[in-house]
Regions:
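Short, well-ordered beta-strand elements
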Residues: 368-369, 375-384
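Short, surface-exposed beta-strand/loop micro-motifs that present aromatic residues
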Residues: 357, 364-373
């Protein structure tokens, strides 16, 4: 990719620190196998790099068309898809979820205890679609999140709920109807399976299979041919290996492309974390977000709807006041949450730059942010689980914003 940092308003020598930083701090000491980075401002690619390897055992260098597991970077895509139906008048954010999933009318709230001795009560108010999009619905991740054990998590396992094992999105949603909520909807924030339910709502409301809706309404208009829920055989050689660290902090294989579950199309595609994508494809999604819903002259979602989605929906609170447990794809201080995106409300409180940006990330150390005020977005792709291993977001943001020149000489 041709880059022009000067035209994009960056000092080239300063922005090149990003390459040096990632190479010397992470690639050379083998803390990660490889990564890709793209920085774009004012519609101009300012920085693009493919570093290290996509597969250590097979000695494959990171390539421009490498396919990544983007995990929770699926969530903003699913949220945009659902809000497309909102724009068609198919639902209101304040609609109770049971309007579309009748069995969810019976949800109860956890009070105390566990298993057969668990005490529950009726909710003070029904769960709405807005609650699902904001992760304030009272759902959890059923014990999946590292270091976070919640009292209702065991009920997910007892109900046979699995992020990967559902037969269909419908059976997944029906099983969730039998699990007590952690709190009254709208009163707290907890990272959860809620966006998987949003994917099912896309299916119910549109009358189309979820994956088909994404393909027709987003991936085709956005020219994202490599984004999907499984890897075709003809693209297998482009699929990156995924890694984790052993007890000695050495890289070890977590998911081999040759034997990966992604080789088989899922029967219940996860709207919360199931997509594979490339840097090119996801950059088109970010182009659309930065251009206020427009891509290649076509308005996919309105500016007003996108502004609603990226606004803080936690009232006057931040994640620091609302979150149950500490897990998130970001720090909680000074950060709000909207309809599928986090947003920096207070840069001083969050200890970062980019106030007013919106963003999210994925389990395998992928991340993006969009900053409308600076007309900028950034994407980072690696394949190291979990994403909390290194603070790539903070480091990359510091270098990127520290490289803005505004016409001065570096």
């Amino acid at each position: 990719m041709i880059t022009d940092p000067t035209a994009a308003g960056f000092c080239p020598e300063k922005l090149e620190r990003l390459n040096t930083h990632l190479q010397e701090r992470y690639i050379t000491p083998k803390k990660i196998a490889g990564c890709q980075v793209l920085i774009k401002r004012k519609g101009i690619a300012a920085f693009s790099a493919s570093l290290g390897q996509m597969d250590i055992a097979r000695q494959k260098p990171m390539a421009a068309d490498t396919l990544f597991r983007i995990y929770s970077m699926t969530k903003p895509i699913t949220s945009i898809a659902l809000m497309m139906l909102f724009e068609e008048g198919r639902f209101q954010l304040t609609d109770p979820v049971y309007k579309f999933i009748p069995s969810w009318r019976s949800h109860r709230i956890w009070v105390e205890g566990e298993g057969a001795s668990m005490i529950t009560r009726a909710p003070q108010s029904p769960m709405t679609i807005q609650h699902l999009l904001c992760h304030t619905a009272g759902l959890t991740y059923g014990g999946f999140l590292p270091g976070l054990e919640l009292p209702v998590d065991a009920a997910y396992g007892a109900a046979g709920i699995s992020r990967r094992g559902a037969d269909t999105l419908e059976t997944f949603a029906e099983k969730l109807a039998n699990v007590p909520l952690l709190y009254d909807p709208g009163t707290r924030w907890s990272y959860s399976m809620a966006t998987d339910v949003c994917g099912y709502l896309v299916e119910v409301i549109s009358g189309q299979p979820f994956a088909q809706f994404l393909q027709e309404r987003l991936f085709e208009p956005l020219d994202m041919p490599d984004t999907g829920f499984s890897i075709p055989d003809e693209k297998l050689d482009r699929f990156a290996a995924c890694y984790e660290r052993d007890r000695n902090k050495e890289l070890k294989l977590q998911d081999d492309p040759e034997t990966s579950r992604y080789r088989n199309p899922p029967t219940a595609p996860s709207g919360a974390g199931g997509l594979l994508s490339t840097m090119r494809d996801y950059s088109h999604f970010c182009d659309m977000l930065l251009q206020r819903g427009v891509f290649n002259g076509k308005q996919l979602i309105s500016r007003a709807t996108l502004e609603l989605m990226t606004r803080n929906h936690l009232g006057q609170s931040s994640l620091a006041q609302m979150a149950v447990g500490g897990f998130s794809e970001t720090s909680n201080e000074g950060v709000g949450f909207g309809l599928g995106f986090a947003s920096t409300m207070d840069a001083a409180a969050s200890g970062t730059v980019g106030e007013g940006d919106f963003y999210w990330g994925g389990l395998a150390s992928t991340l993006f942010w969009v900053d409308p005020a600076e007309d900028l977005y950034a994407i980072f792709m690696a394949q190291l689980i979990p994403s909390s291993t290194f603070n790539f977001r903070g480091q990359i943001k510091n270098i990127v914003y520290g490289s803005l020149c505004e016409g001065a000489q570096s």
